């Protein structure tokens, strides 16, 4: 089976006819498109980029949701400001607001611990383990039994991999479960904040400019990775030393110009380009509109409840940024979808696939039943999603904590670690602890209670048959309750729990299930009461998941074979694993609403043009003065008569690529990917080379802001290779 799958996918790649700028390619696939890369301008041998422990791939790291890269031999890491936002917020107080004022550690001793649970992951190996995950026995199973067998096999593969201490291993699904790859990563656990610009630079334009062009945002920040004195990953300790990466990126201070080759290496989260037409219809017809509505309500409530309360506003700053980002993203997708022919094209392509399958008896026998089954299975999943959508917004934060703690106590009682749930094995305990510890910095009872009350009122107004009776009962609620009645019951629940206290909450981490059952803490009692129903729903979901995996994998096998027959490529959708995309620096001929063009670069002039002195369009006085006096230093571009701030490129990225280094033809750092344009976010579903543009922060602006404005000379010197053996000294 494995040999057949590999030949099928490889053949699809060799027949590649995708747009030159389309595709999030696995490193091992790059030689297959080597001629295209060379023609586009790559100076490196594409084969070198398949070697994950060599340059440049070894310099590219994951932060577990964002991408970053090593930029010095002393473990200096650069990423986006919005990727480090949680750590900046975590270290901020009303008295010392690093979000507002920025932060610079002049010495190693001044560097601050990142938010609990922060990690730097360095991918060192990727192996195809399809035959181990879907072994002959598992291949015969379906439903919940299949899900359980797949998880058991994954845990076994991961456990073997993690015998190499200091590494985190995961199994990632490709092509809808057709293939599985083992990803082995060095896990660096001591991460520290080195430098971030003030929010008026790192988030200039705020949510108004998010996903928009022209853009003038200095979306960059710096971490440093630390290890024990023996060079191995270790928990935070003052005795730890900077990690010395085998490879790091050099900064190309000359930057790029229009038409230059660029590529992005990173960890894109998820794309949906191979989805069924029914999935497109449900997502854009119901799911995204519901998400936008709920997100808008969340933002309004948080704004109302934090107004005039600085400490609460700081606590929810990272949460608000995250909600706002996806709120605008999903609305942008909906706007692009309206009037488009995406669904019609998806339906036509699906009909053509089915016709191709049905035209041959052998193909019909191999693929027919699963293609027929997948549509009804997806419909079943969508119905569950629709019915339980609001439920996901109703839970108080402390109830979530109580449920996690009780599940942990239950799983911990199982002596065989391999039989524990994924997410609750011993390898996961440090992460669970860190997440529970971090709640204090991102929680406010008034805000949390208002959110729960608002969404519970909506949920309890649904027909009783559409409500989860066990959940409603566990919280002491009843269908049809008014918001005032709900509020009164929530007051009792919050007053009866001590989980908001960190010491109390963390003490539960070491208690057994019997202690939970005996507790009179209101949220713990609710968690215990919900356990049986949680298992019932989990069993239901696992059964459906197993059926979907089985059918979807065969659907993808048929799709690859069909496109093979037409000489078309089928690269895998993004799944948070290391990928490479390439393109060029380019504007657009019709970017603006009036049909006028977008030039590829913005400059410092745009900052002063947008400056209002208030809110999202405030800017530091020192920056404005430097712009007025044309203190461009080494970073001015004569043709622009200014310093370039941001630029556009025809790169294929998505969420998770934030912080990805933009590299030139020699794999030197020329910027950081941090956004896309609003009308191109639909590329997650439907790539259009004419409109899709990535927005990057120009490395020349980063260097200018640090050197000329913020006087972060120690960081600039380290980036330039000066005094790198003693950073910050």
Predicted feature residues:
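Terminal presequence/propeptide segments associated with secretion/organelle targeting
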Residues: 2-5, 9-729
């Amino acid at each position: 089976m494995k040999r057949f799958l590999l030949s099928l996918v490889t053949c699809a790649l060799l027949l590649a006819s995708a747009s030159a700028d389309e595709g999030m390619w696995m490193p091992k696939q790059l030689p297959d498109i080597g001629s295209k890369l060379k023609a586009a301008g790559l100076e490196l041998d594409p084969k070198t980029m398949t070697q994950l422990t060599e340059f440049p791939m070894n310099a590219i790291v994951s932060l577990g949701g964002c991408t970053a890269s090593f930029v010095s031999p002393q473990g200096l890491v650069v990423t986006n400001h919005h990727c480090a936002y949680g750590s900046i917020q975590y270290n901020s107080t009303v008295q010392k607001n690093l979000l507002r004022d920025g932060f610079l550690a002049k010495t190693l001793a001044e560097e601050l611990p990142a938010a609990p649970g922060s990690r730097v992951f360095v991918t060192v190996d990727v192996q195809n383990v399809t035959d181990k995950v879907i072994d002959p026995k598992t291949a015969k199973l379906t439903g919940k039994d299949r899900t359980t067998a797949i998880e058991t096999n994954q845990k076994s593969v991961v456990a073997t991999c993690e015998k190499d201490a200091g590494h985190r291993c995961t199994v990632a699904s490709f092509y809808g479960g057709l293939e599985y790859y083992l990803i082995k990563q060095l896990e660096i656990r001591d991460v520290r904040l080195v430098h971030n610009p003030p929010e008026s630079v790192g988030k200039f334009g705020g949510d108004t400019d998010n996903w928009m062009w022209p853009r003038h945002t200095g979306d960059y920040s710096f971490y440093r990775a630390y290890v024990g004195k023996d060079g191995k990953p270790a928990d935070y300790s003052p005795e730890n030393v900077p990690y010395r990466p085998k490879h790091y990126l050099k900064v190309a201070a000359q930057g790029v110009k229009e038409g230059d080759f660029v590529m992005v290496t990173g960890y894109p989260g998820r794309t949906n380009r191979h989805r069924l037409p029914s999935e497109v219809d449900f997502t854009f017809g119901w799911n995204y509109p519901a998400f936008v509505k709920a997100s808008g309500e969340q933002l309004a409530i948080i704004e109302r409840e934090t107004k005039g309360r600085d400490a609460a506003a700081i606590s929810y700053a990272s949460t608000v940024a995250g909600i706002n980002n996806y709120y605008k993203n999903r609305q942008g997708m909906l706007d692009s979808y309206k009037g488009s022919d995406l669904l019609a094209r998806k339906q036509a392509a699906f009909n053509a696939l089915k016709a191709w399958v049905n035209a041959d008896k052998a193909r019909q026998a191999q693929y027919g039943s699963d293609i027929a089954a997948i549509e009804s299975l997806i419909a079943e999943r969508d119905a569950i999603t629709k019915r339980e959508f609001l439920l996901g917004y109703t839970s108080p934060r402390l109830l979530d904590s109580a449920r996690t703690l009780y599940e942990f106590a239950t799983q911990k009682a199982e002596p065989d670690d391999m039989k524990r749930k994924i997410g609750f094995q011993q390898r996961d305990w440090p992460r669970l602890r860190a997440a529970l510890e971090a709640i204090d910095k991102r929680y406010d009872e008034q805000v949390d209670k208002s959110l729960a009350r608002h969404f519970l009122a909506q949920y309890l107004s649904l027909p009783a048959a559409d409500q989860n009776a066990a959940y409603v009962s566990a919280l002491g609620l009843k269908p049809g309750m008014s918001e005032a009645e709900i509020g009164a019951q929530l007051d009792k629940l919050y007053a009866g729990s001590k989980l908001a206290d960190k010491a109390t909450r963390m003490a539960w981490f070491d208690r057994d299930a019997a202690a939970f059952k005996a507790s009179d803490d209101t949220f713990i009692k609710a968690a215990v009461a919900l356990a049986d129903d949680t298992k019932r729903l989990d069993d239901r979901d696992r059964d459906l998941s197993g059926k979907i995996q089985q059918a979807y994998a065969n659907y993808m096998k048929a799709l690859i074979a069909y496109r093979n027959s037409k000489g078309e490529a089928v690269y895998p959708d993004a799944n948070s694993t290391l990928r490479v995309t390439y393109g060029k620096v380019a504007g657009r001929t019709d970017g603006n609403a009036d049909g006028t063009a977008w030039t590829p670069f913005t400059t410092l002039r745009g900052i002063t043009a947008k400056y209002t002195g208030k809110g999202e369009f405030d800017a530091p006085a020192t920056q404005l003065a430097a712009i007025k006096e044309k203190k461009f230093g080494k970073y001015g571009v004569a043709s622009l008569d200014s310093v370039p701030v941001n630029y556009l490129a025809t790169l294929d990225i998505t969420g998770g690529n934030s912080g990805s280094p933009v590299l030139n033809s020699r794999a030197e750092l020329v910027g950081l990917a941090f956004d896309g344009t609003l009308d191109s976010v639909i590329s997650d579903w439907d790539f259009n080379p004419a409109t899709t543009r990535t927005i990057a922060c120009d490395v020349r602006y980063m260097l200018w802001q640090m050197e000329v404005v913020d006087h972060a000379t120690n960081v600039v010197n380290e980036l330039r290779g000066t005094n790198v053996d003693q950073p910050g000294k």
